[in-house]
Amino acid sequence: MSNSVRPAVKLTGIRKNFGLLEVLHGVSLTANQGEVISILGSSGSGKSTLLRCVNMLEVPNSGSVSIMGEEIALNHRSGHPSRPKYPKQVNRLRERAAMVFQSFHLWSHLTILQNVMEAPLHVQRRDRKECHAEAEALLERVGIASKRNAFPSELSGGQQQRAAIARALAMRPEVLLFDEPTSALDPELVGEVLRVMRNLAAEGRTMLIVTHEMDFARDVSSRSVFLHQGVIAEEGLSSEMFANPRTERFRQFLRRDGAASH
């Protein structure tokens, strides 16, 4: 299968338990290359768990995960936690599907420039000069080049999240995963992060985004997926879903979030 038609991410029959509680009930989702998919839902719907299953931060109890056509080999054993068969495969595929977290996860003892350089230099073992030049360019791109020598504690939340996006991009991933990237930000800082994400979407990046930003989901995402109680209750083109919700569950969700179509 050629790269032009190979899905970037394919989740099939994903089930995930935490103890006796099953939070995902056989969810299947395919993201094609260049698609921006927003994953929507109320708290506890399973949306962040689903995203974390993509790069094995949560290991599904059953089902399969493929990234760029390569399936992650898993050991599913009845009565036992599932685990990847080959940790090296997971580490390699995490470079292809980079995660941006709600809480930034920057190294507090490193400068912003060092944070962006860290993984390319020490995980991918790329040339230091190359890593430095690319990190500088990425910080310029997300609008915080002047903060290159600052430490995370010296930055606003929005600046820290933009640094986290630059750090993810430094791995040269084929897929970007965003887990509620604006939820921890003060309202006045949300826009600067969403602008960076809009620019990435305009470049044709493959992005899976768990978000409560309904305007962003409607205007930027090519498709949206609405999770309710661990299953996909509605999915489709974002423009169509927001203009004409097919299910009462999604209509209620939009009304509650103040995101009625316009």
Swiss-Prot record:
Positions annotated to bind ATP: 41-48
Location of this chain's protein in the cell: Cell inner membrane
Keyword Transcription regulation belongs to the record: no
Family classification: Belongs to the ABC transporter superfamily.
Membrane topology: Peripheral membrane protein
Keywords carried by this UniProt record: ATP-binding, Cell inner membrane, Cell membrane, Membrane, Nucleotide-binding, Transport
GO CC annotations on file: plasma membrane
Entry-linked PROSITE patterns: ABC_TRANSPORTER_1 (PS00211), ABC_TRANSPORTER_2 (PS50893)
InterPro entries recorded: AAA+_ATPase (IPR003593), ABC_ATPase_HisP-typ (IPR030679), ABC_transporter-like_ATP-bd (IPR003439), ABC_transporter-like_CS (IPR017871), MetN_ABC_transporter-like (IPR050086), P-loop_NTPase (IPR027417)
Domain ABC transporter span(s) in chain numbering: 9-254
Role according to the record: Component of the octopine active transport system probably consisting of four subunits: Q, M, P and T.
Record has Nucleotide-binding as a keyword: yes
Superkingdom of this protein's organism: Bacteria
GO molecular function annotations of the record: ABC-type amino acid transporter activity; ATP binding; ATP hydrolysis activity
Protein name stated in the entry: Octopine permease ATP-binding protein P
